[in-house]
Amino acid sequence: SKKVDVHVFALASPYRVIVDAPDVDFQMPEGIGKEKRGLITAYRYGLFAPGKSRIVIDVGGPFLIDKAFVLEPRDDQPARLVVDLVPTDEKTFQAKLKEAKPAEEASAAPPPLPEPVVRAPDAKPVIVLDPGHGGIDPGTSSADGVTEKDVVLAFAKSLKAKLEATGRYEVYLTREDDTFLPLRERVEFAQKKGAGLFLSIHADYFPEQTEKATGATVYTLSEQASDEEAKELATKENFSDAIAGVALPSDSDEVVANILIDLAQRETQNRSTVFARSIVGELAGNLHTHKMRSAGFRVLKAPDIPSVLIEIGFLSNPDDEKHLVSDAWRERISVSLVDAIDGYFAKRIARAPF
């Protein structure tokens, strides 16, 4: 309806154009953005952070941003965003990309790990619930248009209320509304809160087995995936940052992460497995055939926090979809997860940071 200030830039691996703007009201037809045209293979849009909207345009190869500007409303035409792209070679693309980055950004070291949180011995255990996706990243969606980001947020809020009602836990959500949070920031949020448990909540989609794929699946971290399906799911979930237009970690970041896992995460992984088994025990009858799996999920890589990812159901299955949008079902499964969390802490196997 009016001209806004925008910031347009390129990202690599994969090739993307990012358009950042103030919080705007996107009024687009349902399902738009999936059609290919010229250099563009797809695009998406949404709230990226409070007060900030983002458009992410997927590009099929190396490119240059020739022009980018916003036209004022004129002659009954609304304000229009214009971005001209031209194809180029990989060398030129990389040179322009490097040229566009501020020197301090290019040379910046990875951010340090948050300082450990010191808590009183009698403090309540801290639990961080992580509703996956959000904002510009909807996650998967059902044939009816029910999105993963919405069902997992509703479920996380239900579980938070149940946990807080016990009076035994201090509970936080990584996001409380329809905003996007990069994977690294989700982990850092849990570390800053001094979490004793981290539970990432998602919903799955498996169109090849619409009727057969049903129920919850519990995942723990493993550098070697338990099976091909777990590996594919981890790849998809780890791609969340790219979908939202976030630069992916460099190889050096991965080396640091792997060192941290080797040094600090062995015992944490054991605790995560104990927690996962507790969930499986309480969700009996509501589980997928392969109820417990493992793979290299970035969001589970906190070296000091027992972390589990749960896919609460399949949006590709009509029966599961009905459950996922049902208040009664959410309440019932939330009660089971509270029992699983109670059981984990009652065993007191690990000295998790409370």
Residue ranges and their predicted role:
Residues 7-9, 16-22, 42-46, 54-58, ...:
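Soluble periplasmic/extracytoplasmic beta-strand elements of cell-envelope proteins
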Residues 7-9, 28-29, 92, 136-140, ...:
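Short, solvent-exposed loop/turn elements at domain surfaces
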Residues 36-41, 137, 179, 214-215, ...:
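Glycine-rich, flexible loop/turn motifs
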Residues 5, 207, 257-354:
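Active-site-adjacent mobile loop/cap segments within catalytic or ligand-binding domains
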